[in-house]
Amino acid sequence: MSSQTQRQPDHGVVRQYSVFVENKVGRLSELVESLAKADVHILALCMVDSTDSVIIRIVVDHPEQAETVLNEHKFANDAMGVVALELPSEAHLQNVADILLRAEINIHYLYPFLFRPSGRCGLVLRADDQDLAAAVLARHGVTVLGQSDLAR
């Protein structure tokens, strides 16, 4: 989306699920299989482990269906908003970091998309304030994606 156009209602913040599982063999496979059977595609993924548990952060193409699957399969989860970005190349990460620094917005974490149909780099970003981060980045010409941009 061009920074010259008005933001669509869903642009700026997309839904991320943090899925909490035991740190044991096969749990990621179970999660991916459960979602795939419901025709839900994982578009971005990040795993953070500790001794006994793992937090699997995912952004999917159909969050409502994903939430149903997660709950039906008893995957403990928490939904929250994150900012999804599309960048011309990996070199533009510096630009994103600089824009948010100048706006005094802290980046809590970020991780890449697994796949973007346009062939561009994609990032998921969690900041102090998702709406403000999305607005500031869009104002500086960064392509901010909405949930409808992620649907297949």
Residues of each region from the PLM?
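Structural preference for solvent-exposed beta-strand-turn elements
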Residues: 1-70, 77-90, 95-97, 101-152
